[in-house]
Each structure stands twice: as C-alpha cells, then as structure tokens.
Regions:
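Short alpha-helix boundary/capping elements
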Residues: 48-56
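Charge-enriched, short contiguous segments at helix-coil
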Residues: 103-162
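Polyanionic, low-complexity intrinsically disordered segments
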Residues: 142, 149-212
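Short, mixed-charge amphipathic alpha-helical segments
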Residues: 13-16, 78-123
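Charged alpha-helical initiation segments
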Residues: 1-40, 172
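Short, glycine/acidic-rich hinge or "gate" loops at secondary-structure transitions
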Residues: 59-68, 165
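Solvent-exposed, non-transmembrane interaction/regulatory regions
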Residues: 72-73
C-alpha cells in the first residue's frame, strides 16, 4: 500500500532528513490519515522541496559547473524568499553538453521526472491558493508514490554514487566501527539505485570495498 510504503520510507531514513523536512513529512501523513488531503499534499510537497534544498546546499559543486553560478545557486537556497523557485530551477535544469556554453545539470534524475514536476508544482499551487481544482486522496497518493520511487535516488552526484560512497565509508575503520551493521545501507540499494544501474553498482561496490 502506497501510504504504508511512504511511512516506512520516512521512518527508515530519518537520518537523511533534517528536523524540518521530517516534520513536514510526518505532518503530511497525519493530515492524510485524517482525510485532510489539500494540506497533506502541500506539506509533502514542502517536505520534498526542503529535502532537495538541503542536498544541494550540502553538496560539492558538480564537475564542470561554473563557480560563480554555483555560488548564486547556494545564495538563493539560503534565502527564505528565493529557495522555492531555486529548487524548482535545480530540478528543471537539464544537461546540455553541446550548448554554448555547455549546461551542467545540478541534480542527477530522469528528465521525464523533471518534466512531471511541473504538474506536481501546479497541484501545490492549487492547494496553497484553494483554487477550484479538486485535490483528493489520489493526488496525495500519486505524489507519495513518486517520492517512494525516486526521492532517495535524486542527488547531486546520483543515488548510485552517493550510496557507493556511503559503503566505502562504512568499510573504512577510520570512519566507521567494524561492529556497526551495514544492513541499513543494504536496505537502501533498491531505493537509491535504478535497476538499469545495478550491474555498475555492484562492480563499483566491489571496487569500493576491495582494499579491505
């Protein structure tokens, strides 16, 4: 069931969410359970926006990205009045290596998902401004389903690379106790790695842990 999967996603990945993001998602779930669907959608959207805001703010500049533009992105993400629009821009920005100058995407995510996000944003606007558009459980569940499938896969470096780095750190005794379980990382594989990347992931995993 979509709602139960979303609850599980949030509960099992609290360490990846800051207090504000976690609170927004938890409040969204409470509203959904109470049948308050407009607010449930709005809070889930805000939670996702905060999640993207944080991962971009905490990331290193993507390879090939213009430093001045990166500084501008970071400044807007820190501004409470500008971050929402900047998050949307980050999501929409596609790579165009043949452009003049070449364009580097900030977020590693499917272009189809970038295109779909205009729909999600429009529904957010419907919720926020109480427009005539009827927001019901199906809209909230559709958004939850998208989050279940893609949220942890979306990073600046890509979900696969991010998870490989976490595995590398987990097997490094200078960073992680040998007694610490890697099961939480194993549980993230299906959430963060696209099926088409699995072979590359396991090749990378062998390389990342081979020095041990």
């Amino acid at each position: 069931m979509i709602i139960n999967n979303f609850k599980k996603l949030i509960e099992e990945n609290k360490s990846m969410l800051n207090e504000l993001t976690l609170g927004l998602f938890e409040d969204s779930i409470r509203c959904f359970d109470a049948g308050i669907y407009r607010q449930a959608y709005l809070l889930a959207y805000q939670g996702f926006t905060q999640y993207i805001r944080n991962i971009v703010r905490d990331a290193k500049m993507p390879t090939g990205y213009d430093p001045n533009k990166w500084n501008s992105v970071q400044a807007k993400l820190k501004n409470e009045k500008e971050f929402d629009e900047q998050v949307f821009t980050c999501i929409q920005q596609k790579s165009c290596p043949t452009g003049t100058p070449p364009v580097v995407a900030i977020l590693d995510m499917p272009d189809t998902l970038r295109n779909d996000f205009t729909f999600w944003r429009n529904r957010r606007n419907d919720c926020a401004h109480y427009k005539a558009y009827d927001i019901n459980a199906s809209h909230v569940l559709a958004f939850y389903s998208m989050l279940n499938q893609y949220m942890l896969k979306i990073t600046v470096e890509g979900g696969m690379k991010y998870l490989l780095r976490e595995f590398k750190d987990a097997f490094d005794p200078a960073k992680t106790s040998p007694k610490e379980s890697i099961q939480p990382l194993v549980d993230k594989i299906l959430l963060m790695v696209h099926p088409s990347e699995m072979n590359d992931f396991f090749d990378g995993l062998q390389s990342a842990t081979s020095f041990h």
